[in-house]
Amino acid sequence: MLHGVTLFLPSIVAGMGEWTNAQAQLLTTPPYVLAFIATIAVGRSSDHFFERGFHMVGCDIISILGFLLLVLVPREKVAVHYFAACLVVVGVYANVPAKVAWFTNNFGGLTRRAIASATIVSVGLVGGIFGGQIYYDGPEYKNGNTIACACAAAQLTAVLILRFKLGRENKRRAQLSEHEKELELLRYGGLQLIGDRHPDYRYVL
């Protein structure tokens, strides 16, 4: 989503009215200013409450609403489309800090965290390949926005499922006896290898 929106926002904005390319580029500035403010706000709130999942869900809902407006509202309603573009950029970009913090928080041990971070970021960057291919049906880009909306909805669903599973695992660990904790340590190779699988480790939700 992030790559597709970044690459094609000027084209999407240009398709809303009779603007030159330079004007369309300038009109992309306010959405990014709003996204900057939202990104800082979401990051601070996420750290303050030490919570990631619901912050990501909130951002996904905002971006989904924006994509739906772009798909369903006629292109002639320029103000609505521009508002929708702002929602999309805010939702997609403000999602990033909570997302990055979430997976780094939940991998214990330097090696596991380093490998996981590199792998997840690399997989995320593959999105740049697909992001440049989905916006092929200008000037309305209904197919591209529909695909991006589906991706946002899929991410929202995945976040809710993962948050539920991590919460359930935290509860399971809280109920372990000392003997069961010792067995878990042995199962994963002792303190040097266990990382976030340690029975006293609690996943960030």
Residue spans for each PLM region:
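Cytoplasmic membrane-interface "Motif A"-like loop-to-helix N-cap segments
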Residues: D47-I61, T111
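Helix-loop junctions at membrane interfaces in 12-TM secondary transporters
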Residues: V71-A85, N95, K165-L166
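Intracellular terminal tails of multi-pass secondary transporters
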Residues: Y141-L205
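Intracellular juxtamembrane helix-capping segments at the cytosolic ends
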Residues: V92-G109
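Extracytoplasmic gate region of multi-pass secondary transporters
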Residues: M1-S46, G53-F54, V96-A101, G127-G132
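Small-residue-rich packing faces within the transmembrane alpha-helices of Major Facilitator Superfamily
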Residues: F36, I64-L65, L125, I129, ...
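C-terminal ends and interior cores of transmembrane alpha-helices
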Residues: G58-E76
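A late C-terminal transmembrane helix in Major Facilitator Superfamily
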Residues: F107-Y141, N145-C151
